[in-house]
Amino acid sequence: MHLGDLKHPNELHGLSLAELEDVARQIRERHLDVVSTSGGHLGPGLGVVELTIALYQTLDLDRDKVCWDVGHQAYPHKLLTGRFNSFDSLRQQRGVAGYLKRSESRFDHFGAGHASTSISAALGMALGRDNRGENFKCVAVIGDGALTGGMALEAINHAGHLPNTPLLVVLNDNDMSISPPVGALSSVLNRARLSPPMQFLSGSVEESVRHLPFMGGELPAELNRLKGSMRRLAVPKVGAVFEELGFTYMGPIDGHDIGEMTRTFQAAHRDGGPVLVHVVTKKGKGYPYAEADQVGYHAQSAFDLSTGKAIPSSKPKPPSYSKVFGQTLIKLCEQNSRVVGITAAMATGTGLDLLQKAVPNQYVDVGIAEQHAVTLAAGMACEGLRPVVAIYSTFLQRAYDQLIHDVGIQNLPVMFVLDRAGIVGADGPTHQGQYDISYLRAVPNFTVMAPKDEAELQQMMVTCLQHDGPTALRIPRGSGEGVLLMEEGWEALPIGRGELLREGNDLVIVAYGSMVAPAMETAALLEASGLSASVINARFLRPLDQALIHPLARRVPRVVTMEEGTLSGGFGAAVLESLNDHDINVPVLRIGIPDQLVDHATPQQSKEALGLTPNQMSLKIQQRFGLGSDDAAKSSPFQAVQA
């Protein structure tokens, strides 16, 4: 069978083992070919090829539901569910999404992008099924990393107390956490766990004893302990943990043996309650470079398949904001032993991997546990440390209560660096950093800022560490502006003070963070049209520099705000509220992300779609205020405004 001809995943049913192994080969080849060309997640999907095939051998995907945790390991799922021929468009504008989307396919049963959600979703589906009296299978596939997330453990705790609710959790243990493969012993233990005698000892014996007339329907404590002991003899220690939580545990099994997994999944489906099947896989399986460097090949830009090396950019780029942050933090940690960097399993993405190597005793990785990371930092701050929490903007959403309750209300000096703030590109709606401006505005006691370039980032880091209260700064994904950087000796910025970059008489542009450089380009375009614009680098969202903004707004009564974030409750809203509260009644044009999701595309394509390029913003400003061309003036709602 050629996968390009596969019309439905149920067509896998009945294929021989040799045919299924050929399907696995085709999936790997297609996966590698596409990701090496356009980039994407590599290692996770390569590791679950056989797992996906074996699982789908035992399911009817017209009825049964599968929730893939995070979703970056679901490329094989996509290749088996009607997207093999369109897979070349992976993570491209209007192409196949890099994560799961219910709107993309009826086989994407639950959308994902963040970790640790799958068990909760699958359990919810199972309860919905039972409520309607229906009969279909509900499955969650979760990695060992995502299982460290509190939400996953909460769901396991709940499901374990529902012994009559069938639910299958597949633990994809890719040898990065929990427990390594244990070879022949694990195979023996698994065969014993599935054998009829062990099923009798661990299950049927209880039912038999309960019906003895002198037992009164209850199992004596002594027999309960004996039953528990027999279970623990039959499974590894990690299995005993899940058994104690109310799950039937099966495994560990070889995650690249289709036959063994198929038999195990079939046995799991026959159970009438929650079951956890522990599958040991090799991340990057089938591509030696990815197997050897499982962290580096988790996700990749375009690369040469024959060498595994990234295809170099056509021209050199300045260092990324993440790298500048990481290198600067090393210096600050070396100068002050009380500074500690904290990450929630994203060291490489945030630049903290540099700190881990250079100053390991001032580095903490809490795993996928954003809530814990924030409150851990709060506790450290109580004891005189200066914690720096480096986290993606989209992931800090997961710890909003802790921001308010544990840091903000107590006014603790915790510094947050929000990486990937703004438009991130190909990862799509679940990863866009478009909400942090809005949600941080409301948190008590916080000082919130964003640099116009990487040099100002260094100054803001010093500002945060010297400030006796909670702080947050946002940095965009990708390269900096290429400005000259200082190795040390950075000076703190005055809190709440912006910067006037250029003066003009026709309008004032107030730009925040990554929009400062585009604002300057926009002002230059306006000047070419005969219009002069003042440009303010706001620097601070909270507190806003009213002393700079208000006089200019009174003198030049046309205000434009620019931000790379959602307009709802955003930076522009803060400026508008400030002007209104001080009776400065001038027209304000807010430019940013409207009330919509930003789908996967390149960052430039997304900005063009949102009207955030300098050319688009220049035209929008002229049209809004009736400045510049006659056509723009005729379409303006503010023709009567006097400069």
UniProtKB/Swiss-Prot annotation:
Record-listed Mg(2+) binding positions: D144, N174
Organism domain of life: Bacteria
BP terms from Gene Ontology: 1-deoxy-D-xylulose 5-phosphate biosynthetic process; isopentenyl diphosphate biosynthetic process, methylerythritol 4-phosphate pathway; terpenoid biosynthetic process; thiamine biosynthetic process
Gene3D superfamilies hit by this protein: 3.40.50.920, 3.40.50.970
GO cellular component: cytosol
Pfam family name, one: Transket_pyr
Pathway info: Metabolic intermediate biosynthesis; 1-deoxy-D-xylulose 5-phosphate biosynthesis; 1-deoxy-D-xylulose 5-phosphate from D-glyceraldehyde 3-phosphate and pyruvate: step 1/1
Catalysed transformations (reactions): D-glyceraldehyde 3-phosphate + pyruvate + H(+) = 1-deoxy-D-xylulose 5-phosphate + CO2
Residues bound to thiamine diphosphate: H72, G113, H114, A115, G145, A146, N174, Y287, E370
Enzyme class: transferase
Transferase in keyword set: yes
Enzyme Commission (EC) number: 2.2.1.7
CDD domains, alphabetized: TPP_DXS, TPP_PYR_DXS_TK_like
Similarity annotation: Belongs to the transketolase family. DXPS subfamily.
NCBIfam families noted in UniProt: dxs (TIGR00204), PRK05444.2-2 (NF003933)
Job of this protein: Catalyzes the acyloin condensation reaction between C atoms 2 and 3 of pyruvate and glyceraldehyde 3-phosphate to yield 1-deoxy-D-xylulose-5-phosphate (DXP).
Name listed for the protein in its UniProt record: 1-deoxy-D-xylulose-5-phosphate synthase
Originating species: Synechococcus sp. (strain CC9902)
Gene name linked to the record: dxs
